[in-house]
């Protein structure tokens, strides 16, 4: 009885028989020798039954999908089955993942199902898979326990697209904006596998008129981050609502990177804008002037909020009001340069065409709002009144 021998300590045994006959001096003639034992189980990888590997070329961030069947072809049960997965790159750097499956019973199969996100991989890769590695449990043979396949991870090289707007408007250097602007930073990426979900990959700073720079991050109370959640629309948004407390020129600097580290441009987005705290209207004119069929009004608003009760009056040179253009008719207005959606066609309040000639116009403002401060030498605008000419 050899059951007392530790099989782990003595994994291999050899039985020798020694006989001795002091009388007849004739060796015993052995008729047979029978050994009773529990045979080790035997598992194999059955590629013919099931084998899945989604592609030999994957986009960075795409999930590697692998599946194969393990089968116990012996009459003895196996304990819980250990599986080892190894990914090796061109530099022989390895990623090893172990998985423990249910016990593999005699003549039964189990599915090895392994998915791995390739976001940290790039270039040529080798994938090794092995059941019962490192002699985890007794087995008759191990040569049929492993397999290997190669694949390639295509690196994301395309940069994300960055878009910045102030109160819904794209501005240029020198534009006037509100003292409490709503700045929307929109980042889009074509990658269908790596979401824009890391706010740390977006750098935002604001330089005030004194040259002081403030950096904003996810912890800043003025900032909110909306991560991308849909791979079909890989878009992240940052809302920034700074309170700009002094007059002067500010500079906003923004740089964004996608999940692969591609930056939105060789140079950061940078725009310089002006804040004027006092509420006023200036640089009022109509265009075209003279006009024959229609004209629009252009003016600059400063301060924090657009006044609710702004309107424009059209008058004859004798001072008679012939047309009132209400706030609602003017259309959407903002702090900064405005060009009204409204196009005046040269008619009065009753829809009648006015005669050719010179007319006056005036912007009506709240009592506490400063009047026009035209910065341009404008021969058509004097003492709060502008001149327009109808010429049909």
Predicted region positions:
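Short, compositionally biased P/S/T/A/G/V-rich stretches that sit at domain boundaries
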Residues: 35-59, 152-177, 181, 188, ...
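Short solvent-exposed strand-capping/beta-turn motif centered on an Asx-Ser/Thr pair
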Residues: 20, 48, 57, 69-77, ...
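Beta-strand-rich ligand- or partner-binding modules
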Residues: 1-79
């Amino acid at each position: 009885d050899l059951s007392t021998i530790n099989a782990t300590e003595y994994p291999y045994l050899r039985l020798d028989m020694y006989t001795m006959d002091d009388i007849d001096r004739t060796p015993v003639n052995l008729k047979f020798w029978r050994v009773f034992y529990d045979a080790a189980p035997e598992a194999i990888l059955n590629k013919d039954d099931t084998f899945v590997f989604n592609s030999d070329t994957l986009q960075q961030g795409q999930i590697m999908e692998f599946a194969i069947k393990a089968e116990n072809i012996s009459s003895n049960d196996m304990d819980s089955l250990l599986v080892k997965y190894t990914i090796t790159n061109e530099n022989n750097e390895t990623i090893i993942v172990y998985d423990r499956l249910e016990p593999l019973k005699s003549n039964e199969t189990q599915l090895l199902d392994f998915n791995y996100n390739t976001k940290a991989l790039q270039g040529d890769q080798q994938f090794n898979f092995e059941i019962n590695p490192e002699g985890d449990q007794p087995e008759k043979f191990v040569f049929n326990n492993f397999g290997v396949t190669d694949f390639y991870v295509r690196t994301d090289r395309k940069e994300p697209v960055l878009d910045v707007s102030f109160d819904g408007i794209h501005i240029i250097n020198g534009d006037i904006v509100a003292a409490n602007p709503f700045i929307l930073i929109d980042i889009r990426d074509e990658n269908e596998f790596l979401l824009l979900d890391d706010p740390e990959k977006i750098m935002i700073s604001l330089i005030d008129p004194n040259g002081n720079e403030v950096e904003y991050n996810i912890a800043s109370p003025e900032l909110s981050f909306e991560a991308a959640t849909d791979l079909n629309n890989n878009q992240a948004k940052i809302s920034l609502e700074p309170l700009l407390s002094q007059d002067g020129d500010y500079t906003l600097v923004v740089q964004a990177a996608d999940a692969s580290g591609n930056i939105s441009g060789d140079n950061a987005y940078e725009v310089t804008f002006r804040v004027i705290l006092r509420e006023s209207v200036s640089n009022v004119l109509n265009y075209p002037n003279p006009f024959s069929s229609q004209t629009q009004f252009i003016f600059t608003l400063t301060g924090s909020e657009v006044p609710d009760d702004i309107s424009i009056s059209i008058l004859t040179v004798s001072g008679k009001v012939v047309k009132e253009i209400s706030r609602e008719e003017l259309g959407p207005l903002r702090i900064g340069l405005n060009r009204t959606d409204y196009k005046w066609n040269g008619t009065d309040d009753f829809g009648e065409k006015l005669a050719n000639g010179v007319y006056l116009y005036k912007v009506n403002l709240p009592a506490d709002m400063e009047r026009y401060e035209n910065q341009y030498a404008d021969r058509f605008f004097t003492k709060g009144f502008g001149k327009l000419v109808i010429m049909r």
